């Protein structure tokens, strides 16, 4: 058992090892031929978020539908940009956000799935207040931790129109256990302490924020997408999420590719557009214009 004098050192080491790496942007929407505006969005704790706002094509009547895109852990909005042209062509205003401690957003004491979700809700509220956006047609798309975050955000914000989840895990405790195994940490000895420490730090019990528990709470349609070769989050998690949902409002698509392959998700992006079109949010595939 960990003795009290060692706890501050252990806690410091845990906080340090779990800190999300910050990646700088190397490209922007203009690199994909899209006009955009860089904006700052107020979040919690007096922090602000960097975001790229890509207005819907001019042929889309206002107020326009919108999609908020949330990256994964240690990533940024730049890495989600390959999805932008196809989603924009589907008639959507796009908002790519950097969550706190990521990309060009403000730093904070730590990053966590709930803080990702808090930032997502603030971004949605910011969008919904714009006169050019239809507040009833705002959908969410997230990858990995960002996928867990958009599911959590939608459980907090029941008016969410739809959710697209890319490579979501079923339960954060299981992700932590996989991480501990990769670090060769003695799970039986120190594992329970680490799990308690992380939950105490983030202010939430893992059960309260686990996608397998938040997904069944959602009122809106959900599309789960997962790569069959995902070595970070087992594809079995996607099937567990579908089973937990227990409703035909939740769809699952298993495709090629691994965990971080935006190219693999891009190859089946029409499924996302068609799913959103079925909810009255996007245009059907093939209806886009050439601007």
Region roles according to the model:
Residues 1-42, 52:
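An N-terminal hydrophobic leader/cap segment in hydrolases
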Residues 72-86, 99, 106-108:
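The serine-hydrolase catalytic nucleophile loop
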Residues 110-131:
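Alpha/beta-hydrolase active-site loop
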Residues 152-204, 266:
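Hydrolase active-site cap/lid region
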Residues 217-219, 224-226, 230:
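Short beta-strand/loop motif that positions the catalytic acidic residue
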Residues 231-237:
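Conserved alpha/beta-hydrolase "acid-adjacent" motif
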Residues 243-260:
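Catalytic histidine neighborhood in serine/cysteine hydrolases
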Residues 257-269:
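Catalytic histidine-centered segment of alpha/beta-hydrolase-like enzymes
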């Amino acid at each position: 058992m960990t003795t009290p004098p060692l706890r501050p050192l252990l806690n410091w080491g845990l906080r340090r090892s779990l800190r999300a790496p910050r990646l700088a942007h190397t490209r922007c929407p203009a690199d994909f031929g899209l006009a955009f505006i860089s904006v700052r969005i107020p979040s919690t704790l007096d922090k602000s978020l960097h975001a790229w706002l890509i207005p819907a094509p001019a042929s889309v009547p206002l107020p326009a539908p919108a999609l908020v895109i949330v990256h994964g852990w240690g990533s940024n909005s730049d890495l989600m940009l390959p999805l932008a042209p196809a989603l924009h062509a589907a008639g959507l205003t796009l908002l790519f956000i950097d969550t706190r401690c990521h990309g060009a957003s403000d730093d904070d004491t730590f990053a966590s799935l709930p803080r990702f979700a808090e930032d997502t809700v603030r971004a949605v509220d910011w969008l919904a207040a714009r006169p050019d956006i239809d507040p009833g047609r705002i959908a969410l798309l997230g990858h990995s931790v960002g996928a867990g975050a958009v599911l959590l955000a939608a459980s907090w914000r029941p008016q969410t129109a739809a959710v697209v989840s890319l490579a979501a895990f079923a339960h954060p405790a299981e992700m932590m256990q996989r991480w501990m195994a990769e670090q060769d940490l003695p799970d039986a000895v120190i594992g329970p302490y680490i799990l308690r420490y992380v939950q105490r730090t983030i202010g939430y019990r893992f059960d309260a924020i686990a996608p397998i528990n938040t997904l069944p709470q959602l009122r809106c349609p959900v599309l789960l997408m997962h790569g069959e070769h995902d070595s970070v989050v087992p594809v079995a998690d996607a099937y567990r999420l579908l089973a937990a949902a227990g409703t035909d409002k939740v769809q699952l698509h298993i495709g090629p590719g691994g965990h971080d392959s935006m190219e693999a998700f891009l190859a089946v992006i029409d499924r996302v557009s068609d799913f959103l079109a079925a909810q009255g949010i996007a245009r059907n595939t093939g209806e886009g214009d050439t601007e």
